[in-house]
C-alpha cells in the first residue's frame, strides 16, 4: 500500500537528505505529497534536517520553471507537485510513473525503492531487465541512477544525487527522448507510456 511505502522509504530518504545537507548546507528540501498520506508524511518528516517544505495536493495556478526560486512554496506550501518538480535542482523519487512526471519537468532524478524481503526475492527471480525506471526503459538508456531493494541505502543514493547537482545536464537527452516518444501520435498518454515501456522491455531482452 502507499502507506507501507511511506513507512519503508521515508527513513531511507531521511538518511539521504541528512547526508546531502551536510555536504550542501544551503539545500532546501521539498516533499510533495498526496491527500491519502499527507498527514503521515507531515508527521514523519517533522524532525528531518533542513525543515522540509511540504507541498500538499492543492493545485497551484502558476507555472514554474527552474529559473524561479522556492520562495512561493515556502510561503504557501499549497502548490502542486508539478510546480515543485519544475523548481527543483534534483529529485529523489520512488520508482514508478513519477519518473515520467520528473522528465516532463526536466528535473534530474535519482530513483530509489525498497520492498519487503519476500517481495525482493520473488521480483529478483522474475525480473528480466536491468532497470525498472520508466525513463531508462522508454529512452533505451541507463542514465537515471536507481537503487532498488538491498541497494536502497543512503550511502549509495547520496553520491548519485551529488553527481547530478554537479552535472544537471547529464539526463537531459534521455528525458527529451522520453517525452518525444510519449508525445507522438494521437494515442492517449497512458497507452503511449505502456507501449513505449513494452518496446523498451523488448529491446532490453533482445526481442524485436
PLM region spans:
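Nucleotide-activated sugar donor-binding and catalytic core shared by glycosyltransferases
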Residues: 1-208
Amino acid at each position: 500500500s502507499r502507506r507501507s511505502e511511506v513507512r519503508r522509504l521515508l527513513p531511507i530518504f531521511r538518511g539521504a537528505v541528512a547526508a546531502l545537507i551536510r555536504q550542501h548546507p544551503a539545500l532546501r528540501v521539498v516533499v510533495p505529497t498526496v491527500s491519502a498520506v499527507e498527514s503521515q508524511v507531515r508527521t514523519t518528516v517533522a524532525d528531518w534536517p533542513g525543515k522540509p517544505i511540504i507541498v500538499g495536493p492543492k493545485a497551484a495556478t502558476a507555472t514554474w520553471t527552474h529559473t524561479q526560486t522556492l520562495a512561493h512554496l515556502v510561503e504557501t506550501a499549497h502548490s502542486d507537485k508539478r510546480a515543485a518538480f519544475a523548481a527543483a535542482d534534483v529529485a529523489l523519487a520512488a520508482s514508478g510513473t513519477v519518473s515520467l512526471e520528473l522528465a516532463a519537468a526536466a528535473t534530474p532524478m535519482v530513483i530509489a525503492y525498497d520492498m519487503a524481503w519476500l517481495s525482493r526475492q520473488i521480483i529478483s527471480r522474475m525480473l528480466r531487465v536491468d532497470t525498472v525506471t520508466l525513463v531508462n526503459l522508454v529512452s533505451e538508456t541507463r542514465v537515471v541512477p536507481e537503487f532498488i531493494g538491498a541497494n536502497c541505502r543512503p550511502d549509495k543514493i547520496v553520491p548519485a544525487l551529488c553527481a547530478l547537482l554537479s552535472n544537471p545536464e547529464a539526463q537531459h537527452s534521455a528525458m527529451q527522448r522520453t517525452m518525444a516518444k510519449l508525445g507522438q501520435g494521437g494515442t492517449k498518454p497512458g497507452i503511449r507510456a505502456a507501449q513505449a515501456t513494452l518496446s523498451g522491455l523488448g529491446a532490453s531482452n533482445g526481442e524485436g
